[in-house]
UniProtKB/Swiss-Prot annotation:
Location in the cell: Membrane
Presence of the UniProt keyword Amino-acid biosynthesis in the record: no
Record's protein name: Pheromone-regulated membrane protein 10
Gene source species: Saccharomyces cerevisiae (strain YJM789)
Membrane topology: Multi-pass membrane protein
Sequence intervals crossing the membrane: 453-473, 475-495, 505-525, 529-549, 568-588, 604-624, 629-649, 659-679, 681-701, 740-760
Positions of the UniProt region annotated as Disordered: 1-125, 139-169
Encoding gene (name): PRM10
One GO CC term on file: membrane
Length: 770
């Protein structure tokens, strides 16, 4: 053991570098190009060059993990097998060869220790050197973890304590996900930050002073899939978007980072400065210790880290230019955050406007996805009846912001046209998000074209016009339908708007009032008032035809949750109407025993006169839904064409309501989509009045709405109780089933027409069609 202390020792750091050829030829390892120490002569003298192995304070008690090999040949075989295993496991995960790797990623040549076997004359010395060799060649670093060879899987060249101290039994695939996350956060700034690292070492500036001069890669760097408009390098190659490519607009190759990520970038410099000082202070050692306690951080040599302790006292060169650069970066980040907030606000307001003004519900998610893609926002959308769940993702911080857009769904054809115009301008990049927000705010703040009192008159006129062509009423019934429509319109547009409690029972109360008054007018002797025509005509506008149509379209477009909820609600809604009609008729029958029992009109007007009432009904119902006068010609033309198809198809297919509705809806859809494709109009606003014409016609073809009247006649004539009306479930359910048949046929025809005109969909904007 005395000979060990007398002979000159080789610095411990010499064991980790240098090729076997250099070692055997007697080349000094300190002059090797792979020698990983500082270039400063002072650091070489102050750290390891003057220390021997015995002076490191290593005792036999510390050698708990030392592997003893009694045979020298076994040692050589063990070393050769370990070197082969290390070379196999140290290949890059990206499949690059040794020649394709960057200079800083290439593996260091393994040190050949075979020439050291016979250097010592004492057997104890040889055994002790073997212990050191066995531990140095292991993956865990043995006695001195900082001197272990750097594995090539540490591609980033960063401090990775978890990899350095990991157990050999843990497969490398367990760390694949974490490695991917780190690679994504580093982004395209690896070469840039390496250059800045060298520059910061030359200038002797403080680590963490600015983002650009930091010698450590920023964990919050822009991700590969994102870019910041204030970053110097925002280029990316073939990056895939986050949103699935099931719709027409391809996902953007780059999306904006979120607000939280930008805010963290704003305060990243201060956080990095404090954290770097704390972490580096633990790695700094005194000259008496000679070696760092955290030498396992293999990328930073001990000599370089030892001079970090006095950097704060040195003069900082070029501080003012860096401060100006930092202030400029903060200003750009502030502008970036404002732009992101404007885009988020535009998406939310566009969603609210589309829901309030009657956009096709089965295409709402498609519209919002396309809008977010054009605005380069990572957004996910889920539509439920009455609300839209919006999630704005931020992959930089692995967080998301969830917004709930909830509003009462209505129908406003003119405002829908205006919102669609803003949507098209933003999608085609002719209007910014901030200007779009201003326009949407103005549209939302504008009042309706027609006040409530005018809507009441239009409702009454619609009831009068639908009675002759749909339910067979004569000229006398027009006045009665107008009067009862006036009552229903007052309940809907005046009383329901003022009382929230009454709005929940509006449908039942309206059906009770209409059936009661209709039977009262029909019981007047020699009045020629048709009880069934005036009752159905007055209730035609509150039929759940549009609700069932939206549900059928959603189910056909695979929106199962929204479609199922809407369909079930429409069926229950139909049962409410049927119950109200039965109850109102029975009430008047109990009060007046000579009440009329006729549910069909004895006198019918000429079928050719019916065609005159269709355009009048189309105009009135379009104005009732807040359509502009400029939109009326196209609506009237499409509506009249659809009714002509319905009338002649009903002559040939008398017992097939759904087939007749499908043919008419196909013609309506083709005309509406051609209007959108050729004249660049809004197809949904032109098609909706024509669809409203089809629903009452389909209902009247089977007289399903009169099932409640038939039940009321049975109650009055047989002097039975109301419980008799529930004995025949087929009569109470027939109205809802007829509505479903008509709307399913309409939905099939509309989808077929969209496929006929737009076989491949639209390239950039959503298809604003039913």
């Amino acid at each position: 053991m005395d000979g060990r202390n007398e002979r000159p020792t080789t610095p411990v750091s010499d064991f980790r570098v240098g090729s076997s050829e250099q070692s055997q030829a007697g080349v000094n390892l300190e002059d090797s190009s792979d020698y990983r120490t500082s270039n400063s002569a002072e650091s070489k003298k102050g750290n390891l060059s003057g220390k021997s192995i015995s002076d490191l304070g290593i005792s036999n008690n510390d050698n708990k993990n030392v592997r003893f090999t009694a045979d020298t040949d076994a040692l050589e075989n063990d070393l050769s097998s370990r070197s082969t295993e290390t070379s196999d496991n140290s290949k890059g995960t990206d499949g690059q060869g040794e020649e394709d790797r960057p200079a800083r990623h290439k593996r260091k040549p393994k040190v050949s220790f075979t020439h050291l076997r016979n250097n010592g004359k004492d057997g104890d010395d040889e055994t002790f050197i073997k212990k050191i060799i066995n531990n140095l060649t292991g993956n865990q670093g043995g006695l001195v973890p900082g001197l272990a060879p750097i594995p090539s899987e540490n591609e980033n060249g960063k401090d990775d304590i978890e990899k350095n101290n990991r157990n050999e039994e843990i497969p490398l695939s367990d760390l694949a996900d974490a490695s991917k996350i780190v690679d994504v956060h580093e982004g395209d700034n690896k070469e840039k930050l390496e250059a800045l690292k060298l520059e910061s070492d030359v200038n002797c500036t403080s680590d963490g002073e600015t983002l650009g001069s930091s010698s450590k890669n920023s964990f919050l760097a822009p991700a590969v899939d994102h870019f910041d408009d204030y970053a110097e390098n925002n280029s990316s190659d073939d990056n895939e978007g986050f949103i699935e490519t099931s719709t027409y607009v391809p996902p953007p190759s780059q999306v904006k980072s979120g607000v939280l990520g930008s805010l963290l970038k704003l305060y990243q410099n201060e956080d990095q400065n404090s954290s770097s000082i704390f972490s580096d202070s633990q790695a700094v050692t005194t000259d008496d210790e000679g070696i760092s306690s955290t030498a396992g951080n293999k990328d930073v040599p001990v000599a370089k880290r030892s001079r970090l302790q006095n950097l704060k006292g040195k003069a900082k060169k070029g501080r003012m230019p860096r401060l100006k650069k930092r202030l400029k970066t903060e200003a750009k980040i502030t502008v970036h955050i404002a732009d992101i907030l404007q885009r988020h606000r535009f998406i939310l307001r566009m969603c609210r406007a589309l829901m309030m003004y009657g956009a096709p519900t089965h295409r709402l998610e498609e519209y919002m996805v396309m809008t977010s893609r054009v605005l380069e926002i990572d957004g996910q959308f889920l539509y439920l009846p009455g609300c839209m769940i919006v999630s704005f993702g931020d992959a930089t911080t692995r967080t998301s912001e969830v917004q709930l857009v909830r509003c009462t769904q209505g129908l406003n054809l003119w405002k829908l046209h205006q919102v669609h115009a803003v949507y098209k301008r933003v999608v085609h990049d002719t209007l910014g998000a901030d200007e779009g927000n201003a326009l949407l705010d103005q549209i939302l703040a504008d009042t309706n074209l027609y006040p409530p009192w005018m809507c009441v008159l239009l409702y009454a006129f619609c009831s009068a016009m639908v009675t002759p062509y749909a339910f067979g009423g004569d000229w006398v019934n027009l006045a009665i339908s107008f009067f009862m429509g006036l009552c229903v319109g007052s309940l809907q547009f005046i009383l329901s708007q003022k009382s929230y409690m009454y709005s929940n029972v509006f449908e039942i109360s309206a059906s009770i009032v209409v059936s009661f008054c209709g039977r009262a007018f029909g019981s007047i002797p020699r009045s020629h008032i048709c009880f069934g025509a005036v009752t159905q005509g007055s209730l035609a506008l509150i039929l759940p035809g549009y609700i069932i149509l939206c549900g059928a379209l959603e189910l056909q477009s695979r929106s199962l949750v929204a479609g199922a909820v809407r369909m079930f609600y429409a069926i229950i809604y139909s049962l409410f109407l049927g119950f109200g009609i039965t109850l109102g008729s029975a009430l008047f029958g109990w009060m007046y025993h000579n009440a009329t029992n006729e549910i069909s009109c004895p006198q019918l007007i000429s079928p050719w006169f019916r065609f005159l009432f269709v355009p009048a009904f189309t105009i009135s119902i379009s104005l009732l839904n807040q359509a502009h006068i400029s939109q009326l010609p196209v609506m009237v033309f499409i509506s009249c064409t659809g009714y002509v198809v319905t009338y002649w198809a009903g002559k040939h297919f008398a017992n097939s309501t759904e087939f007749t509705a499908a043919l008419a809806a196909f013609v309506i859809g083709v005309l509406g989509n051609l209007y959108s494709r050729i004249w660049k109009g809004l197809a949904v606003s032109a098609m909706l009045p024509a669809i409203f014409v089809q629903v009452p016609s389909g209902i009247a073809s089977q007289n399903s709405l009169l099932s409640g009247l038939q039940s009321a006649n049975t109650i009055v004539n047989a002097n039975e109780t109301i419980t008799t009306s529930t004995s025949d479930p087929s009569s109470s359910m027939s109205f809802g089933m007829t509505m479903i048949q008509v709307c399913v046929g309409i939905s099939v025809g509309l989808f077929a027409s969209s496929l006929f005109v737009y076989p491949f969909g639209k390239k950039k904007t959503g298809l604003f069609s039913l």
